[in-house]
Structures are given as structure tokens and as C-alpha cells.
């Protein structure tokens, strides 16, 4: 049995724009928010978790989405010297049409985050997701979550931090997505 701590990334550019637009989903389709990054508010959220979450010192493994906002959140919570294991299956839903969910290439990620220990992502982002006829379905998300659950079975008696996104964590935790807070460690046993 593992202790899994699921953490949504800190507040990001696209979250702020969505709020300011009175919740207009067209924000997510704007290239202005491509590779959405943490805002000052998101940085503060991650620092507060770093300062106030005692369990962070007991984490054995950090699993993280390949999105910069998640990697930055992990580095703030656990320090820039922490070893991060990056998994493509932890990215946000939907992959496609939402530019804020576009990620850097494998080469860019490794260059920008030298503390990545392992990385399980294709070299290039799957551009076909940005074809309106091919973007990721809810069923694809469920398959990713199941793949991740199977992956977690390879660990035993570990404390694992999972840094991911609202929709992915909502599906994984079986919680309403609107209840998933930024930089809050939801603990489950798995």
C-alpha cells in the first residue's frame, strides 16, 4: 500500500485569464496562454505548501506532469535539487484545442529542468490533438488514469507525490473537478 499525495499545480496564467474573462472557455483556445506558467499567486501557493506541509519531507518519489506549471510547482514545493519523474499520462485533459495544455519537447524539458530523473514522454507533443476532429476524448482520459493506476502498482510502501492538473486529478480521485484546490495535498492510500 502506498500513500499518494495528489497536488494540483499552482495558479497559472490561464487560470487567471479564465477568471477575469468571467469563465469564458475561449481563453483556453488562445495561443496567448500556450504553455501557461505559474503566476505570482501560484508561486506563493507552492511556497506556502513548502512551508506548511510536514509530509513533504517523507516523500520517496515525485511523479509529475510534463507541463512547466507542474514542474515549477514541484521545484518550489520540494526544492530545485529534488528528483522528478515525469509522466506524459499526468498531463491535463483535454490534450488538444487548449493551448494552455501544450507542452515543451523532450529536449526542452530536459534542458530547462536538470533535476528530471526519469522522463516518459514522446519527444514531440502530439500535434494531431490540435485537430478539432482528433482531440482527446473523456474516454482517453479514463484510459490514461487507468494506465497511471497500473503504473502505481509497481511501487510498494512508498510515499508518492503526484503533481498534476484539475481534470486528471478529478478523474483519478473521483472528485468533482471544481473541488480540486491548487497546491493542496489530497492523500489517498493505493
Spans of model-derived segments:
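Phosphate-handling substructures
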Residues: 13-37, 79-144
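Beta-strand elements within well-structured catalytic alpha/beta cores of enzymes
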Residues: 3-7, 63, 158-168
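GST-like fold's C-terminal all-alpha helical module
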Residues: 141-145, 149-153, 160-165
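Active-site-proximal alpha-helix that buttresses catalytic centers in soluble enzyme cores
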Residues: 2-86
